[in-house]
Amino acid sequence: AITKLAGQALAAGILLLYGIQVLWLPINGVTMLPPSVGQLLTVLIVLVTINAVNFIDGLDGLAAGIVAISGAAFFAFAYLLAVVYGFNRAGAPSLITAVTIGVCLGFLPHNSHPARIFMGDSGSMFLGLMLAASSITLTGQVDPNAISEEKLGPALLPLLLPFAVLAIPLADLTLAILRRIRAGKSPFSSDKEHLHHRIMRAGNTQIRTAGIMYLWTATIAFPVSVSAFAPLWVSAIFAGAMLAFTIHFSRGKSKSFRTLESANRG
């Protein structure tokens, strides 16, 4: 665990070396951060994002699919800033997210259940690093005051987007760390209590479990991204429709599990 953290911190240091760091936060207006605070926050974001993606990599195709969906939501916002608002700095995260999406989509056919190739820690941590780099470049270095107030608002979107895009991995990471600390274990020890394990125990196959988590990722990430270029009421309707479908899909059980339940009752 210490070796992994050291490697992740080194990767964050390389980003800092090339000028990729959080410059300000959209809190109480636009708060310009002192360089030391921005650098510390950058390292923290990198460590959290890398481990969030690494922790979620517990089923065939799960991490690659979630990162592809998260990258798509990031790309929509980055493309808007680069093309519509003309922000030159948004070009780099647009390219990073496009490459990340392509890598994940190309890998998924080989990694979906039953997987023939596994990404392992090195793959999942690299995807986390790519997401962290695009997130910092996109939301930590672009002036939110330039975003139209007719949309979600200049103070909210850059703050909400990274959390929305990574909501599922971050939730799983937080719950896992708290659960293991309460049990007196290392936060990096393994267990079978991740979100995907619980969904499978509820009667879902690996493929259906991955699909459920894909849908929840999209349901949280895409409406926030859409709010950057659509009125809030449009985003709300879009979010409501996605939420209704995702809840309906999540409440179902796989056909094989229903057959097994019927046999047990008989």
Model-derived segments and their meaning:
Residues 51, 60-63:
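PRPP/pyrophosphate-binding module of the type I phosphoribosyltransferase fold
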Residues 62-266:
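Alpha-helical transmembrane segments
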Residues 29-44, 89-102:
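Structural signature of hydrophobic alpha-helical transmembrane segments
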Residues 7-22, 41-49, 67-73, 101:
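Membrane-embedded alpha-helical core segments of multi-pass
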Residues 1, 16-30, 79-85, 139-146:
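Transmembrane alpha-helix boundary signature
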Residues 1-7, 61:
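Membrane-interfacial loop-to-helix junctions in multi-pass inner-membrane proteins
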Residues 5-10, 238-240:
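Hydrophobic mid-bilayer segments of alpha-helices in multi-pass membrane transport proteins
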